[in-house]
C-alpha cells in the first residue's frame, strides 16, 4: 500500500529534499510551506518525474496554530489517511 507523507517546510532545503526522496520511493505527498509558488513548482516537478503518485500542496504558516490543524485535516481528508508527518518548518 502506498504511504501518505505530510511534510511542513517543504518548499526548500531539507523539506524539499525529503519530498524528492519519498516521491522517488512511490509515496504520496502532502506538502506545505509559506511559499506556495515554490510548492507548486515542486509539485509539477515531482508529478512529472513520478506520475503514479499524488502530490498535494497548500500554503501554511506554522505560526498560525489553528491553520496547522485545518491544513493537516484537509490533507488527511483528501488522501484518506496520513502515515507520517514530518515537522520540518
Protein language model annotation of sequence segments:
Residues 83-84:
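Conserved catalytic-site loops of classical short-chain dehydrogenases/reductases
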Residues 55-57:
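Hydrophobic/aromatic anchor residues within beta-strands of the central parallel beta-sheet
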Residues 88-89:
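Conserved NAD(P)H cofactor-binding loop of Rossmann-fold oxidoreductase domains
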Residues 9-13:
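Conserved glycine-rich cofactor-binding loop
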Residues 25-42:
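Conserved glycine-rich Rossmann-like NAD(P)H-binding loop of the short-chain dehydrogenase/reductase
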Amino acid at each position: 500500500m502506498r504511504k501518505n507523507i505530510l511534510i511542513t517546510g517543504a518548499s526548500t532545503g531539507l523539506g524539499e529534499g525529503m519530498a524528492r526522496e519519498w516521491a522517488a520511493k512511490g509515496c504520496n505527498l502532502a506538502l506545505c510551506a509559506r511559499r506556495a509558488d515554490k510548492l507548486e513548482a515542486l509539485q509539477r516537478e515531482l508529478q512529472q518525474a513520478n506520475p503514479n503518485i499524488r502530490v498535494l500542496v497548500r500554503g501554511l504558516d506554522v505560526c498560525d496554530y489553528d491553520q496547522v490543524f485545518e491544513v493537516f485535516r484537509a490533507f488527511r481528508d483528501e488522501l484518506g489517511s496520513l502515515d507520517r508527518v514530518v515537522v520540518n518548518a
